[in-house]
Amino acid sequence: MSVIAPSFDMANILTELSSFLGALSLGCWVVLLIPQLLENYKNQSGESISDLFLIIWLIGDFFNVLGSIYGNVSSTVLVLSFYYIVSDSTLLMQIYYYRWKAARRIASREHEPLLQSRSLEEGLHAPIGKQQIWWDRLSTRQQFGVMGCVVIVSTIVGNLIISSASSDKSDDDLNAWPFTAGCISSVLYFCARIPQIIKNHKAKSTEGLSIIFFVLASVGNTSYAFSILVFPASDYLNYTYANLPWILGAFSTIFLDIYIFYQFIKYRNHY
């Protein structure tokens, strides 16, 4: 009696794995800023986030959009690239809104003797007062659980998006414009972390930063890089070279995120 061994199509398996990792990355990036937006709202301040961090990141988003346009990607992927710009801009505007609100509060009290001795700079960086929201009542483990569920849903949606865009994907074509835009955006994404690390070091604190924000960024970058690496391209070397800026950009930012995690541990008893 002969036993027929099951046949495995490794190319299909790797393609499905690549799609799953890409969807997981997409799921993380779609909800990435929600924890930090909630943290800022709770504190009524965004002074824990470096302006330069977000501005450089936003410029990187613009080059990412340029790469998407010149790369002839599907309209869905292009819309997601614009979504990243909108979400990052929202976080940046939230920070400046709280600064404007704090400046108005200081200006309205300038006639009070005690407040006359305070500088405007102190007023701008002072939180207006914490807001109690449902997110704040959850433990850190529960917050991770909630965001995990949201990421799962986003991953499922992301898988559908990637599946719809797969027919437009070229696995081994190198286009100069997307490659150049990818190089620039990867460098910007890497450099964006540096002002935040310096800010944390000077303040000797990570208070007001959401650790979930950086966890999602790390998972998103890791899964994104491996989604590229495991894809069974017909010309793997040329394919890898064409995607090298995004691979190096993803892995390099992970190392800086790890250092930020170290800062969370180092400064956790400072506040």
From Swiss-Prot:
Record InterPro entries: LAAT-1, PQ-loop_rpt
Residues where Phosphoserine is found: S119
Disruption phenotype annotation: Increases vacuolar arginine levels and decreases vacuolar lysine and histidine levels.
Alphabetized GO MF terms: basic amino acid transmembrane transporter activity
Key words, A-Z: Amino-acid transport, Membrane, Phosphoprotein, Repeat, Transmembrane, Transmembrane helix, Transport, Vacuole
Similarity section: Belongs to the laat-1 family.
Name the record gives this protein: Vacuolar arginine/histidine antiporter stm1
